[in-house]
Amino acid sequence: MTHCCSPCCQPTCCRTTCWKPTTVTTCSSTPCCQPSCCVSSCCQPCCRPTCCQNTCCQPICVTSCCQPSCCSTPCCQPTCCGQTSCGSSCGQSSSCAPVYCRRTCYHPTTVCLPGCLNQSCGSNCCQPCCRPACCETTCCRTTCFQPTCVSSCCQPSCC
């Protein structure tokens, strides 16, 4: 508890595979940390060990907590991450395209959600550059389902 955060925080979130890789490794089966005391030094309550690992859809350690939708999808597992399509191995349809759901999406420190489907591009996937409000050079780098870079802002039609 002393290495986690304030006393109101339970240590179950404070894993090396959760949120920050430098967090303490001792854990228990108690409920997860509350955001009121753990948002800065512990894993956020949405983090789950099966999702918030350094292999979760990224080849490097995550710098932000996984969202519930990320933790609930099979594509968040290491068996799927990095593939151009998920298929049956991830329990997703062939339209799953984590090829553009990577750390380079919009902001380098953003944890992009895996298993992005065509219907969800620009909403809960990591493709905010497909929104007219995000017309910045650093934002528009990858078109939907294509690993090629673009130099101009993405249009809604790219999704």
From Swiss-Prot:
Q: Does the keyword Cytoplasm apply?
A: no
Q: Which Pfam families match?
A: Keratin_B2_2 (PF13885)
Q: Does the keyword Repeat apply?
A: yes
Q: Which GO terms describe its cellular component?
A: cytosol; keratin filament
Spans of the sequence repeats are 8-12, 13-17, 32-36, 37-41, 46-50, 51-55, 56-60, 65-69, 70-74, 75-79, 80-84, 129-133, 134-138, 139-142, 153-157
Identify the stretch(es) annotated as 15 X 5 AA repeats of C-C-[RQVSGE]-[SPSNQ]-[TASPI]. Answer: 8-157
Task: Output the InterPro entries linked to this UniProt entry.
Answer: KAP
Record key words, sorted = Keratin, Repeat
Subunit structure, as described in the record: Interacts with hair keratins.
What does the UniProt record say this protein does? In the hair cortex, hair keratin intermediate filaments are embedded in an interfilamentous matrix, consisting of hair keratin-associated proteins (KRTAP), which are essential for the formation of a rigid and resistant hair shaft through their extensive disulfide bond cross-linking with abundant cysteine residues of hair keratins. The matrix proteins include the high-sulfur and high-glycine-tyrosine keratins.
The family annotation for this protein states:
Belongs to the KRTAP type 9 family.
Q: What name does UniProt use for this protein?
A: Keratin-associated protein 9-8
Species whose genome carries this gene = Homo sapiens
Whichever gene encodes this chain, its name is: KRTAP9-8
